[in-house]
């Protein structure tokens, strides 16, 4: 989900000179890459990693919701007998992360907590984080899957609704998609359209500290309305 293709946490240091030239110790970097863990079996995770400008790893999040047939092959032992295989990661399946975590930064330079979401994890309504104890949602994505279809636009639209539901701003970085800053009311503050490269800066983002009505009750609201209607 990032610009450094086929790069893992272990070999990220080869970009140290490039990063040091363009960033200072006042910067942190969020990079989408693969993390490979070796043990009894090799596990590969679609990851969002947070680094300082020396490319020292600060924290990492493993994607929880994987794309069937894209990132993993369901019923692999059975379906592989028919020649089916997933289409990414050199035909290896990604492993599933098991924690929807908040990344917290709390020092003299950086005081921020954010909820990392990778790719289409942003489309899930009411499943983001039970405690809602974060300042901003950061979503990275590779939308090249969709080509010239309506897909990247639909994917982006989901981000707007998540911002409204949670009362949190969303910072979205999407290769071959729409990158944007969305405020806690779902308004698009800044935007880079498809196939446009660039950057934008921001400060003093507002967000709702308390849980919103939706983040308290989630999609149970709609079941309640259905019961009333019946």
What kind of feature is each model-predicted range?
Residues 1-230:
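Enzyme catalytic cores with a strong preference for nitrogen-chemistry domains
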């Amino acid at each position: 989900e990032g610009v450094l293709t086929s790069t893992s946490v272990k070999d990220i240091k080869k970009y140290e000179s490039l990063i040091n030239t363009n960033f200072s110790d006042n910067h942190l970097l969020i990079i989408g890459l693969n993390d490979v863990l070796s043990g009894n079996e090799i596990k590969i995770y679609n990851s969002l990693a947070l680094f300082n400008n020396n490319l020292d790893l600060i924290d990492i999040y493993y994607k929880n919701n994987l794309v069937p047939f894209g990132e993993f092959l369901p019923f692999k032992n059975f379906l592989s007998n028919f020649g089916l295989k997933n289409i990414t990661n050199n035909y290896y399946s990604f492993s599933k992360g098991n924690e929807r975590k908040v990344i917290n930064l709390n020092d003299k330079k950086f005081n921020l907590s954010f909820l990392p979401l990778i790719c289409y994890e942003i489309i899930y309504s009411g499943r983001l984080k039970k405690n809602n104890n974060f300042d901003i949602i950061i979503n990275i994505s590779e939308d090249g899957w969709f080509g010239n279809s309506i897909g990247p636009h639909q994917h982006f639209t989901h981000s707007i609704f998540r911002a409204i539901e949670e009362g949190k701003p969303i910072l979205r970085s999407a290769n071959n998609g729409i990158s944007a800053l969305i405020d806690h009311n779902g308004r698009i503050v800044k935007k880079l359209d498809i196939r446009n490269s660039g950057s934008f800066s921001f400060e003093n983002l507002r967000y709702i500290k308390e849980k919103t009505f939706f983040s308290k009750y989630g999609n149970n609201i709609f079941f309640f309305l259905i019961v009333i209607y019946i």
